[in-house]
Regions:
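Conserved small/polar residues in nucleotide/adenosyl-binding loops
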Residues: 181-186
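Short secondary-structure subsegments characteristic of cysteine-rich extracellular domains
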Residues: 158-178
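Loop-rich catalytic cores of soluble enzymes, especially ATP-dependent carboxylate-amine ligases
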Residues: 1-137, 156
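Glycine-rich, often proline-containing surface loops adjacent to acidic residues and nearby aromatics
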Residues: 139-153
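Generic solvent-exposed, charged/amphipathic alpha-helical segments
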Residues: 5, 146, 168-172
Length: 186
């Protein structure tokens, strides 16, 4: 995963297909994007706006000092587990339960592990009924989730064979050990 994270920018650059965004995503904030119509902003020559600041993300992760360590499976799961146990003052103000309803799962920075929004996430065997980090430690990485792939609008399946070949080669290339120092992401 670590080496793939270093190179996954190529996926959005080469295959990005989201140069436009619904105006509601910006919630009235000022933007340098151009107006396409009543409901849409766009950026000329953009590849993937959803992978930038406009896309869905948990801003508390970086602001609260959450750093996920990709240098080993053990460090990855340890840092992810720490993030879901780290309390958030902002979420404490909301509370968990009131008026007979749950407002959120807990008061922590990450409510659940799947709320960590990285472009590359190692995943355990889906048949495991435990938390993802426990599944990873139990059985290792079953597959890697690549969240930077946009649907290809020029094909009925959302991805074509050439894209799949490229991504497969990028993953294989990422398996080659590289002598970089540690990689920890916010």
């Amino acid at each position: 995963s670590r080496n793939l994270l270093r190179n996954d920018w190529m996926i959005a650059y080469l295959f990005g297909c989201s140069p436009a965004v619904c105006k509601s995503y910006l919630s009235g904030k000022k933007t340098q994007l151009e107006s396409f119509d009543q409901h849409t902003y766009y950026e000329k020559n953009a590849t993937s706006l959803r992978m930038g600041d406009i896309g869905y993300q948990n801003n508390l992760e970086e602001n609260m000092g959450v750093h996920i360590d990709y240098n080993s499976l053990e460090k990855y799961t340890e840092s992810l587990t720490k993030a879901i146990k780290e309390p958030s003052d902002e979420y404490k103000k909301i509370g968990v339960f009131s008026d007979g309803y749950y407002k959120q799962i807990n008061e922590n920075i990450l409510q659940i592990e799947n709320e960590y929004y990285s472009t590359v996430r190692p995943k355990p065997d889906p048949s495991y009924t435990c938390r993802p980090s426990k599944g990873l430690l139990k059985g290792g990485v079953n597959y890697i989730e690549l969240r930077s792939i946009d649907n290809n609008i020029y094909t009925n399946t959302g991805i074509d064979l050439e894209q799949m070949y490229f991504i497969e080669l990028l993953i294989i290339y990422s398996l080659i050990p590289v002598s970089y120092t540690h990689l920890t992401l916010p």
